[in-house]
């Protein structure tokens, strides 16, 4: 049987350009009967813009040519007879198969194999488009690996400098939308919270991250947590064969010297892959913050210098075994350590009225020991009995061990700096957390029009927290306690997607049953305080998408999601922060639930999103008066939040040497506070703007300029956040066919990234301010060697201009 001859480069380019011009006509043909199919990559994802050709046999006359859409789908008019189906796309082996056609039908999915080449054979003659931000179907993709963010240091630093993502001084991560944010890595939810989550993100090197995907309305296969949306950190996939090593080393400086290194080794065959990795980040991090409050007519001014001296270390091993196309086993184990001392120095001026200084409190927190040790272990198995069916099982175990020892001398002085008295406090909190999870997922795609997802998940969380508190060497039984928290979850979900020509409908439901138990044992009482809870909740989602043509798409999305309280926020005990401020948990916190609807429109490289969010049982940390001169911070369900928002994302190559992307958001917040005896409503508009520019300079140097701006906006309760923003600059250049790369960047050039806010509640007027060591200069060198198998190789200008 004769075969279609290899198509030379010029003919291939011409046909591909013609296919691009005729893309809208090809997509319009979906409304008609025809020959349908899908082209998938090695991970089972649809390949965009693959060239699909149909040639008659035996004369090899080319009958049809088209390209696949973003889901890897293609469509031909009906033909009768024997034909040769040929599929080509850069970076993958050419696919050819004899087929017989007689009527409209859906062909089986076609999986392309990556083309394996050596580094010395790769000749790049043009530059791939490098937008930092793109958007489609209501999702925003931040392309970390092709921007300066890959040199930022760790995952937490990447999130801090990513458009549309905010990270406060406590490490809390949020989006512009209402509610909390759930963090995923490669589609797997991180069950960690608070300090534990920050610890993990600080030990995840930015060099490992491929991209970040933000989704405000994910389907039911994702957990219900994250009422504001989810952030999915997608790590770089190993597309290398043989033995390969990559290593990077960086140094940074502004206020403190920092150094980070990571090393990754992999050995891959057709049947199995083994990977080892190590990274560390060493150096101090400085923060300055404070507040001014007027309580019952008396003013206090407090300023704090904070230096975090902890270092991070991480090591891991990955093993994957795939004996055939149907079975795959994956094992992963990592250990992360965040350890080291720390110190804060606080000076508080205490006034009688607003202008008469009467006392000065000087407090110091000396963290003589801080250690967070984290183990993550995962085992997963994937079975594909056929090309349209996939079953997967996974088991995860995460252990977190956190310890701290803090000495806190407090000294009181008169206005003329004469000593009055001093106290010496000591605290020793310990925290042990174990998280176990079992998951089973099922995916069935009988044809190109239907897809079914289903799964079950069960998790067990155990958190044991204890704290020893001493004053002047004597145990303070009123502030020493042991808090135990246990949580059991059983979840099940189903999602069905149906495509009719240009219309796609998807609906899903996730069910969650949660049982909680908490026990507080105080040293002042033999009786333990216990609380239990049982909840059954349903979380539906729905989306409808209409493909107007090849460049225009409109979608309507709805989802219901939640945020659960942090474990430590449920501890009802009272902790001393300094002699004028306290923190107390709340065992009666309820999850906050968000209903969200979004209308999304995509036109070529422009995406527009209009959304409305309603957050019930909203909880946040608030500051209230405590006695005549003290304040207490606690977390409460305080009412309802509503938000109307409009987002626009645009990315385009403006010239052959300039890639541009921008993200604009306009929002209107309504906080309806209704708790205890407090009733008040706060309304405020706000806006967000980010822009990223990538320039190709002479000598192959890439220059990147990125900036973000947040306007004045309503905070969590009665406070108002002041405007903030930052500008980053980056330079990088590669040698040796990309094996050697050097990057120089400066973050927050003008040192404008701050967390300032103010607010008034009853007889409390509070204004706080702060900033971290966000401005720094970083130099990073990356080197890799070995034989690589690239997922895509860009070889010619015409193909690259299409990207």
Task: Please place each PLM-identified region on the residue numbering.
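Short, acidic, small-residue-rich periplasmic hinge/interaction motif at the N-terminus
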Residues: 51-55, 88-90, 106-148, 168-170, ...
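Short, acidic Ser/Thr/Gly-rich low-complexity loop/linker segments typical of extracellular
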Residues: 57-73
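Short acidic/polar hinge/loop motifs at secondary-structure boundaries
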Residues: 75-77, 155, 161, 188-216
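N-terminal periplasmic accessory domains that precede
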Residues: 108-111, 155-158, 173, 197-201, ...
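Outer-membrane beta-barrel translocator/receptor signature
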Residues: 224-231, 239-289, 309-313
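Face-selective signature of the C-terminal outer-membrane beta-barrel domain
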Residues: 314-338, 366-521, 547, 551, ...
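Outer-membrane beta-barrel signature, preferentially recognizing the C-terminal barrel domain
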Residues: 431, 481-487, 533, 562-616, ...
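Gram-negative outer-membrane beta-barrel transporters
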Residues: 637-713
């Amino acid at each position: 049987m004769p075969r279609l001859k290899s198509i030379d480069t010029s003919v291939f380019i011409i046909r591909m350009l013609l296919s691009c011009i005729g893309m809208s006509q090809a997509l319009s043909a979906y409304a008609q009967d025809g020959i349908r199919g899908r082209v998938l990559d090695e991970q089972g994802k649809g390949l965009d813009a693959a060239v699909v050709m149909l040639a008659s046999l035996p004369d090899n006359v080319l009958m049809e040519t088209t390209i696949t859409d973003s889901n890897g789908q293609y469509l031909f008019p009906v033909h009768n007879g024997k034909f040769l189906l040929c599929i080509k796309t850069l970076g993958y082996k050419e696919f050819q198969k004899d087929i017989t056609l007689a009527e409209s039908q859906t062909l089986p999915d076609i999986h392309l194999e990556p083309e394996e080449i050596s580094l010395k054979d790769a000749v790049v003659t043009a530059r791939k488009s490098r937008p930092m931000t793109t958007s489609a179907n209501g999702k925003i993709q931040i392309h970390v690996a092709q921007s300066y963010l890959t040199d930022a240091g760790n995952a937490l630093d990447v999130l801090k400098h990513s458009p549309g993502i905010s990270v406060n001084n406590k490490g809390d991560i949020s989006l512009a939308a209402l509610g909390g944010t759930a963090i995923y890595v490669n589609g797997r939810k991180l069950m960690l919270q608070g300090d534990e989550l920050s610890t993990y993100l600080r030990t995840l090197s930015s060099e490992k991250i491929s991209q970040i995907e933000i989704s405000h309305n994910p389907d039911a296969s994702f957990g219900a947590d994250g009422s504001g949306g989810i952030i999915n950190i997608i790590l770089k996939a190993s597309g290398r064969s043989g033995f390969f090593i990559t290593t990077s080393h960086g140094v940074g400086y502004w206020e403190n010297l920092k150094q980070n290194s990571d090393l990754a080794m992999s050995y891959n065959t057709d049947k199995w892959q083994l990977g080892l990795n190590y990274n560390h980040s060493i150096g101090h991090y400085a923060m300055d913050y404070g507040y001014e409050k007027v309580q019952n007519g008396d003013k206090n001014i407090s300023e704090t210098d904070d230096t975090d001296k902890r270092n991070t270390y991480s090591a891991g091993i990955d093993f994957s075994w795939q004996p055939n196309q149907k079975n795959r086993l994956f094992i992963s184990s990592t250990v992360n350590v965040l350890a080291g001392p720390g110190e804060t120095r606080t000076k508080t001026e205490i006034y009688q009225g607003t202008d008469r200084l009467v006392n000065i409190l000087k407090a110091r927190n000396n963290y003589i020991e801080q250690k967070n040790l984290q183990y993550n272990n995962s085992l997963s198995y994937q079975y594909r009995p056929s090309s349209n069916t996939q079953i997967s099982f996974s088991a995860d175990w995460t252990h977190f061990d956190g310890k701290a020892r803090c000495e806190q001398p407090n000294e009181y002085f008169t206005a003329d700096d004469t000593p009055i008295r001093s106290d010496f406090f000591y605290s020793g909190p310990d925290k042990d957390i174990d998280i176990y999870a079992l998951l089973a997922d099922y995916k069935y795609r009988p044809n190109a029009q239907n897809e079914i997802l289903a799964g079950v998940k069960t998790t067990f969380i155990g958190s044991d927290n204890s704290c020893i508190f001493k004053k002047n060497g004597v145990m303070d039984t009123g502030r020493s306690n042991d808090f135990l928290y246990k949580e059991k979850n059983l979840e099940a979900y189903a999602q069905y997607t149906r495509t009719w020509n240009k219309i796609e409908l998807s609906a899903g439901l996730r069910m969650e049953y949660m049982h909680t138990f908490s026990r507080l044992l105080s040293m002042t009482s033999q009786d333990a305080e216990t609380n239990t809870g049982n909840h059954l909740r349903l979380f539906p989602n729905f989306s409808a998408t209409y493909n107007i043509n090849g460049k225009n798409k409109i979608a309507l999305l709805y989802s219901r999601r939640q945020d659960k309280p942090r474990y430590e926020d449920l501890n009802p005990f009272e902790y001393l922060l300094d002699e004028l401020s306290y923190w107390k948990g709340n065992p009666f916190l309820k999850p906050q639930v968000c209903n969200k609807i979004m209308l999304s429109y995509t036109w070529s490289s422009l995406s527009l999103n209009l959304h409305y969010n309603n957050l019930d049982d909203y909880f946040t940390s608030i500051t209230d008066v405590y006695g005549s001169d003290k304040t207490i911070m606690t977390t409460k369900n305080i009412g309802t939040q509503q938000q109307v928002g409009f987002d626009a994302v645009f990315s385009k190559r403006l010239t052959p040497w300039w890639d541009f992307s921008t993200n604009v958001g306009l929002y209107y917040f309504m906080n309806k506070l209704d708790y205890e005896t407090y009733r008040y409503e706060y309304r405020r508009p706000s806006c967000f703007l980010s822009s990223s520019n990538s320039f190709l300079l002479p000598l192959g140097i890439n220059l990147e300029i990125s900036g973000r701006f947040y306007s004045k906006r309503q905070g969590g309760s009665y406070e108002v956040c002041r405007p903030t923003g930052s500008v980053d600059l980056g330079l990088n250049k590669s040698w040796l066919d990309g094996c050697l790369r050097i990057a120089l960047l400066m973050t927050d050039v003008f040192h404008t990234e701050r967390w300032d806010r103010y607010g008034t509640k009853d007889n409390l007027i509070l204004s706080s301010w702060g900033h971290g060591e966000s401005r720094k200069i970083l130099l990073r060198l990356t080197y890799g060697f070995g034989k690589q198998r690239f997922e895509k190789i860009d070889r010619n200008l015409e193909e690259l201009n299409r990207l």
